[in-house]
Amino acid sequence: MFVGIAAVALAVPRALSAQVPDDTPGLFERLNLDKLRLTAFGAAFGPVAPTNTEPTVAYSLHADYGEIARNWRVVFTATYWGTRYTRETVARLEDKLRESIVDTTVSARFELGRIQISDIAVGGDLRWTPSARVARPYLGGGLLAHVVNAEGKAIQGTFIENALDNIALGFAAVSGVDVSLARHLGIGLQARYDLTSGVRYGTLRATGTYYFDTAPGRGAR
């Protein structure tokens, strides 16, 4: 699972920063996309409680492609979490199904059982980092593509499964702090809120990062 997510997190920015034809001069230079290069790579995890689901843990990977402008960094991310809908949510869904069907025998029963749900979100953040010290707070936002998948024995292959599955763009707000522990290693704490069609959630994540060059604030030795 994470091998595939990591490949996507690395492939997307490489595609964006690929060389463009000579007949479009100045575009990448004006946007500073030609400056992007992989400077750090890391992982994060933390508790998450998406709407109408049981709390779970989110796992993510991040690839830092450096500054696109002064104090503004581009960070590509890929996040996964999996859980199930709460019993109350499933009960409400059963009630709506019951109300939508005319049952002349008054004997129809709806028992959907456990419905699993997962989300894979891939996209990029633009983060404002005002300093390059050992401890570096940041604030920013992102645009991500979410792939939400629902599974359950009772809904497999039905219109219910199709209705719960979703592929949509979403937005994220992010803030946190990164701390350089050693020349190439850093840790951090991040608060994040993701919003997309049908799913929204906040999470607090612990992060770990490997810097290919010297970590900010450490200096060359």
What is each model feature region?
Residues 2-14:
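Bacterial N-terminal signal peptides
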Residues 14-74, 80, 204-221:
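Short glycine/proline- and aromatic-enriched beta-strand/turn motifs that initiate or cap beta-hairpins
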Residues 33-41, 70-74, 133-139, 167, ...:
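Outer-envelope beta-barrel architecture signal
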Residues 37-39, 53-59, 116-122, 135, ...:
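Residues that define the transmembrane beta-barrel architecture of outer-membrane proteins
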Residues 44-52, 83-85, 145-152, 194-198, ...:
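Sequence/structural signature of outer-membrane beta-barrel proteins
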Residues 46-49, 107-113, 157-163, 191-196:
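Extracellular loop and loop/strand-boundary signature of outer-membrane beta-barrel proteins
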Residues 62-155, 205, 210-212:
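Gram-negative (and chloroplast) outer-membrane scaffold detector with strong preference
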Residues 83, 173-221:
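Predominantly the C-terminal beta-signal and adjacent terminal strand-loop region
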